[in-house]
Amino acid sequence: MARIAGINIPEHKHAVIAIQAIYGVGPTRAKSICAGAGVAENTKIKELDEATIDKLRDEVAKFTVEGDLRREVSMSIKRLMDLGCFRGIRHRRSLPLRGQRTKTNARTRKGPRKPIKK
């Protein structure tokens, strides 16, 4: 298996789809990575030689992906919580951030219903 950015890339998939297994690489970025490395989008990973995979690694390294991106996102959320702004408070309380109603909805964010103890 080819390893790019510390992730095992599925070899039986096309290059554009396989690169999206990396956290932080979506469809648009995957196409630009393939174009920058000179890889056809419909080429399967197992058909690529080691030099081409190295080119893909170099293209992926230009972006913030995987652990660095996860750390960046978590630090951004932590900063909001430390500031005590509205979004930070909503993060701390595990409630929706963007003005959605919470009286009847928001079950995903709030978790399962808790029964009222008598």
UniProtKB/Swiss-Prot annotation:
GO molecular function: rRNA binding; structural constituent of ribosome; tRNA binding
Domain of life: Bacteria
GO biological process: translation
Keyword Cell wall biogenesis/degradation among record annotations: no
This protein's record includes keyword tRNA-binding: yes
Residues that span the membrane, as ranges: none
InterPro entries in alphabetical order: Rbsml_uS13_C (IPR027437), Ribosomal_uS13 (IPR001892), Ribosomal_uS13-like_H2TH (IPR010979), Ribosomal_uS13_bac-type (IPR019980), Ribosomal_uS13_CS (IPR018269)
Ranges for region Disordered: 94-118
Cellular component per GO, a single term: cytosol
Alphabetical keyword list: Ribonucleoprotein, Ribosomal protein, RNA-binding, rRNA-binding, tRNA-binding
Free-text function comment from the UniProt entry: Located at the top of the head of the 30S subunit, it contacts several helices of the 16S rRNA. In the 70S ribosome it contacts the 23S rRNA (bridge B1a) and protein L5 of the 50S subunit (bridge B1b), connecting the 2 subunits; these bridges are implicated in subunit movement. Contacts the tRNAs in the A and P-sites.
PANTHER family in alphabetical order: 30S RIBOSOMAL PROTEIN S13/40S RIBOSOMAL PROTEIN S18, SMALL RIBOSOMAL SUBUNIT PROTEIN US13M
Family named by the database record: Belongs to the universal ribosomal protein uS13 family.
Subunit and interaction comment: Part of the 30S ribosomal subunit. Forms a loose heterodimer with protein S19. Forms two bridges to the 50S subunit in the 70S ribosome.
Protein name as catalogued: Small ribosomal subunit protein uS13
Native source species: Alteromonas mediterranea (strain DSM 17117 / CIP 110805 / LMG 28347 / Deep ecotype)
Lineage: Bacteria, Pseudomonadati, Pseudomonadota, Gammaproteobacteria, Alteromonadales
Gene this protein is translated from: rpsM
